Amino acid sequence: MGLEALVPLAMIVAIFLLLVDLMHRHQRWAARYPPGPLPLPGLGNLLHVDFQNTPYCFDQLRRRFGDVFSLQLAWTPVVVLNGLAAVREAMVTRGEDTADRPPAPIYQVLGFGPRSQGVILSRYGPAWREQRRFSVSTLRNLGLGKKSLEQWVTEEAACLCAAFADQAGRPFRPNGLLDKAVSNVIASLTCGRRFEYDDPRFLRLLDLAQEGLKEESGFLREVLNAVPVLPHIPALAGKVLRFQKAFLTQLDELLTEHRMTWDPAQPPRDLTEAFLAKKEKAKGSPESSFNDENLRIVVGNLFLAGMVTTSTTLAWGLLLMILHLDVQRGRRVSPGCPIVGTHVCPVRVQQEIDDVIGQVRRPEMGDQAHMPCTTAVIHEVQHFGDIVPLGVTHMTSRDIEVQGFRIPKGTTLITNLSSVLKDEAVWKKPFRFHPEHFLDAQGHFVKPEAFLPFSAGRRACLGEPLARMELFLFFTSLLQHFSFSVAAGQPRPSHSRVVSFLVTPSPYELCAVPR
């Protein structure tokens, strides 16, 4: 075929692609569609978004276009929701119409399919309801909200304190130990066992989980999801998600070993055994979501979502304690101290721990009601850390209206949770560490309506009760046994952040001195 023959063919292909592009963006011309930057042909707004720091990019776009603005990511229409009013209206008031998830073809390489979508990314329908109901009831049966699970967490907190004590007051980075402790709680729930902190397979699993979450952001990943044909190119999606793929392979080994110890005649000891029991009951039902492929996805969801978010929050908590010694210890800060000044802080974590719990008895969830200052500090750590700035994407299942704008069926929705947690109209000091956000004038704990670190609505994080328990028991146990400080002669760490899918504190070291 000569070049002369290729020219008409190229023109036909170009015209076809332009028509497809116009077909996907025609809704932008509809009345009351949210405003946004002008999309480029084919690419849409892919080049307008900094996927390495999406929250900052969205903040700039919000300043230009308002709380509800639109994007076109290749052929995918997207609406970004900012501020408490828009997020609550979409996720709560119109929750039934916004509870779906958009297609995610990139995850097919991980084994995602019609009957194996896990819980977090599952389409809104019978399979999601089945798995959500199963997860909630199983966690409750395993002791969530009861003394049995609380005992698992307090035992792990004791192991974590022992590992901190092994540092003998020397400077160290706490992140790795925090990851191990939180992951062991998830391992106990899902596999009925805990790992030693130096177990090679355990360390490998944690490394893969950390690297896998980093794959949740980036330009190429967004392109693969926005153009459905691209994930079918051999090895392309596998390369982008290679750490998540390796993580699931490692998880498969643990699940295979666990199956060998499962006795169907005995009550389930953990979530995996409860899932296998459901799978046996569902034999012969082709529509059931209880199958081997979905087991690995469900357990993987719990590991990835439950481990890194909680451990990152604890890492923020310890950093903020060494930067705000008055909040940690409840003492007057010397006039020359650069931390907060010369006032006596009304929030004193260790003083409250000593008054309510003492330094011998282990903390219990029952103590929380009598510890408003500590509870306020933990919530302010979540508020200030703002570790999940963007919620998991939603999709409209019918035409809806939000804040006066018309959003068509099939539109991807992104909730900018950071815009709610940093809303200057709601928070007195949104960009400063200020535990008083969660205390009233009488010193009682209060939770502002704009505190939404776990999102809101039908797809709000199902692990929120577990996360609250872990944060309170781990944080109080550590502050009960140790005083934390910057190592002598080292520069004071900063509040600076590393932004990816999660927002983590910049690497820092601390000293844990037994009290």
UniProtKB/Swiss-Prot annotation:
GO CC terms in record: cytoplasm; intracellular membrane-bounded organelle; membrane; mitochondrion
Expression sites by tissue: Expressed in brain cortex (at protein level).
Keyword GTP-binding appears in the UniProt entry: no
Cofactor annotation: heme
Topology Extracellular: residue spans: 1-2, 323-515
PROSITE patterns linked to this entry: CYTOCHROME_P450 (PS00086)
Catalytic activity from the UniProt record: an organic molecule + reduced [NADPH--hemoprotein reductase] + O2 = an alcohol + oxidized [NADPH--hemoprotein reductase] + H2O + H(+)
Sites where a glycan is attached: 416
Domain of life: Eukaryota
Subcellular location as annotated: Membrane; Cytoplasm; Mitochondrion
Coiled coil: none
Alphabetized UniProt keyword annotations: Cytoplasm, Glycoprotein, Heme, Iron, Membrane, Metal-binding, Mitochondrion, Monooxygenase, Oxidoreductase, Transmembrane, Transmembrane helix
Cytoplasmic side stretches: 24-301
Pfam families from the UniProt entry: p450
Annotated EC: 1.14.14.1
SUPFAM superfamilies: Cytochrome P450
GO molecular function: aromatase activity; heme binding; iron ion binding; oxidoreductase activity, acting on paired donors, with incorporation or reduction of molecular oxygen, reduced flavin or flavoprotein as one donor, and incorporation of one atom of oxygen
Record bears the keyword Mitochondrion: yes
Sequence intervals crossing the membrane: 3-23, 302-322
Top-rank EC class of the record's enzyme: oxidoreductase
GO biological process terms held by the UniProt record: arachidonate metabolic process; xenobiotic catabolic process; xenobiotic metabolic process
PANTHER family: CYTOCHROME P450 2D6-RELATED, CYTOCHROME P450 508A4-RELATED
Function recorded in the entry: May be responsible for the metabolism of many drugs and environmental chemicals that it oxidizes. It may be involved in the metabolism of codeine to morphine. However, another study could not confirm it.
Family, per entry: Belongs to the cytochrome P450 family.
Name assigned to this protein: Cytochrome P450 2D7
Organism this protein belongs to: Homo sapiens (Human)
Lineage: Eukaryota, Metazoa, Chordata, Craniata, Vertebrata
